[in-house]
A protein has these predicted regions:
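Eukaryotic intrinsically disordered and solvent-exposed regulatory patches
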Residues: 25, 36-37, 308
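Extended acidic low-complexity intrinsically disordered regions
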Residues: 84-92
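Intrinsically disordered, low-complexity linker and terminal regions at domain boundaries
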Residues: 74-85
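Short, basic/aromatic beta-hairpin or loop at an interaction surface
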Residues: 5-18
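Domain-scale detector for complete catalytic domains at protein termini or as standalone homologs
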Residues: 91-213, 217-388
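Short alpha-helix capping/helix-loop boundary micro-motifs
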Residues: 21-27
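SH3/SH3-like beta-barrel superfamily modules
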Residues: 30-74
């Protein structure tokens, strides 16, 4: 029988169970616990007759639940675990012509919205008449492009001094100028959209680098997988910091799935990512009404980008460009060996290190740490720029 996972009800102690299919039938005394697995006996519209899989949760052994309430999922089909493994050896990848046509068609529809996704583009006086290189930046969860484009940093200063580098720092929908856009909860839809909107900036042959942080590394990874499938140029190098490689087994993921967390649980999870930041400058995100109106919905969506991520690239050819993947020494969840798994993804040069004392976010928000972090990134990027 098909199985379902209970993902709703965290704020109420579980999902309401009724004795019969009708919404007016008697409710059971106990609720079905969030995280439980149930077997489908019968599915009628959005009403599920279930039997609880022993040992997976608590609540009535059998009953009826709604799989959705007001558009919010309470139960989702349980997917079979897919074997996850490393890439294969480097080699050619056949162009996916259907995918290419699809991305090109989407580009034609949304290319005029480019500056909504890259809000600093005109402010930084782009496009450049003599652009020599571009740097594509992908931000972390709950953040925005401003972590890269903030003024007077070693990164922005260097880019400005060259006068020949365009910084393409992308916003994910649901923030800044895209505040009213639907937030993505899966990289499978986010990465193609981010490629479509800037396709002409990748396909024109200008050399480029990629810098991703935290979940931005997985978004960048899927973005690069798509670029390769389209037969477009690969980057000169990538910087994928503060997050494990995407082929790390699901069982090794140290964080909690946000779908199963109450609102207070999401707050606790966020705090755990970098308590140094969220007990300091970052604590303002918990102030009301900003927390419930802005930050909580954003975190719930952004967390799912990695919580629910399904890796589907076992055995595909590894890349041949250099990968820099650095660990933040003060991390709570991520460990150095998780970050080092990125080495599996290149046949080229590989670089890793631990950034002393830095947390998952303080590397961006602590002025001293940010200066050190950005200086090191720039020192490495200069080598690729000077070699052009």
């Amino acid at each position: 029988m098909p199985q379902w996972e209970i993902v709703g009800g965290a704020d109420k102690g579980g999902v309401l169970v009724r004795e019969g299919q009708a919404l007016g039938s008697p409710a059971t005394k106990d609720r079905l616990s969030t995280g439980a697995t149930v077997e489908e006996v019968e599915l009628v519209g959005e009403r599920l007759h279930y039997k609880l899989v022993e040992g997976t949760g608590t609540g009535p052994a059998e009953g009826w639940i709604s799989i959705k309430v007001s558009g919010k999922e309470l139960a989702v089909p349980k997917e079979e675990d897919v074997e996850i493994g490393p890439p294969g050896e480097a080699g050619p990848v056949e162009v996916d012509e259907d995918l290419k046509k699809k991305i090109e068609a989407e580009h034609a529809k949304i290319k005029d919205k480019f500056e909504l996704y890259v809000p600093k583009y005109k402010f930084l006086k782009y496009p450049l008449a003599d652009c020599k290189m571009r740097i594509f930046c992908f931000h972390n969860a709950g953040s925005a492009e401003s972590v890269y484009t903030g003024p007077k940093t070693p990164f922005t200063d260097w880019v400005k001094e060259t006068g020949k580098i365009e910084m393409i720092a992308l916003d994910f929908p649901g923030r800044d100028k895209l505040n009213k856009a639907t937030k993505h909860t899966t990289i499978e839809t986010l990465a193609p959209e981010l490629l479509a909107v800037c396709l002409d900036k990748v396909s024109d042959g200008k050399p480029y680098l990629v810098w991703g942080h935290s979940v931005g590394t997985w978004v960048a990874f899927e973005w690069l997988i798509l670029i390769r499938k389209l037969g477009l140029p690969m980057p000169k190098a990538v910087f994928l910091n503060a997050f494990p490689a995407p082929h790390m087994p699901v069982s090794m993921r140290p964080w909690h799935r946000s779908k199963k967390l109450s609102d207070d649980g999401v707050k606790e999870e966020l705090m755990s990512w970098d308590s140094g930041h969220f007990t300091g400058a970052g604590k303002v995100v918990f102030d009301e009404p900003g927390w419930k109106d802005t930050w909580l919905p954003m975190m719930r969506a952004d967390f799912q980008l990695y919580d629910e991520y399904k890796f589907k690239h076992t055995g595909v050819p590894k890349f041949d460009f250099p990968i820099h993947a650095w660990h933040m020494e003060g991390e709570h969840f991520n460990k150095k060996d998780m970050i080092e798994m990125w080495k599996d993804w290149t046949s080229g040069t590989w670089d890793t290190c631990a950034m002393e004392k830095m947390g998952h976010l303080t590397c961006f928000y602590n002025p001293e740490y940010k200066k050190q972090y950005f200086t090191k990134v720039v020192e490495n990027m200069k080598g690729y720029y000077d070699a052009l």
